[in-house]
């Protein structure tokens, strides 16, 4: 029987607080390095704040959907490495020690759209998208909601 009262060490750090070339941390190379560091330090737990799309004031606690992931945490360099974004060139940023969500949104949205446009045919042709839609039935309604929200200026 496994003991449930064993002490474990850990850290609370939101993904956007990780270092990296973008205006906020992502689930990319820095996240992998951080997990390796935690393991080497004997830590067993990494607790993060909610990772859904942020709401008013970029609060992770005011998400429009508890099931969706925040697209700004997608690492564009990994999309490039996997062939979804072959022409990606990261914009240079001064290290300020603070996440800049306004700049992040302005820079990242066009790249994410470009990755989709570049890979759309491949993603739709292999049948995985249909399987994915069946596994996640809430996705269609959420996508419609977000499209309408954007169309009507985030109202």
Where are these regions (language model features)?
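Acidic/aromatic-lined carbohydrate-recognition and catalytic surfaces
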Residues: 2-155
């Amino acid at each position: 029987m496994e003991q449930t009262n064993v002490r474990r060490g850990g850290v609370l750090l939101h993904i956007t607080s990780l270092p990296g070339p973008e205006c906020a941390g992502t689930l990319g190379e820095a996240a992998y390095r951080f997990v390796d560091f935690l393991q080497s330090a004997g830590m067993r737990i990494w607790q993060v704040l909610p990772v859904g799309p942020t709401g008013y004031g970029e609060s992770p606690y005011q998400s429009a959907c508890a099931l969706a992931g925040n697209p700004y945490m997608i690492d564009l360099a990994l999309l490039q490495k996997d062939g979804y974004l072959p022409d990606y060139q990261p914009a240079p940023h001064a290290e300020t020690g603070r996440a800049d969500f306004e700049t992040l949104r302005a820079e990242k949205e066009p790249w994410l759209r470009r990755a989709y446009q570049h890979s759309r045919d491949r993603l739709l042709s292999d049948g995985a998208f249909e399987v994915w839609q069946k596994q996640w039935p809430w996705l269609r309604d959420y996508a419609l909601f977000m499209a309408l929200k954007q169309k009507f200026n985030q109202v």
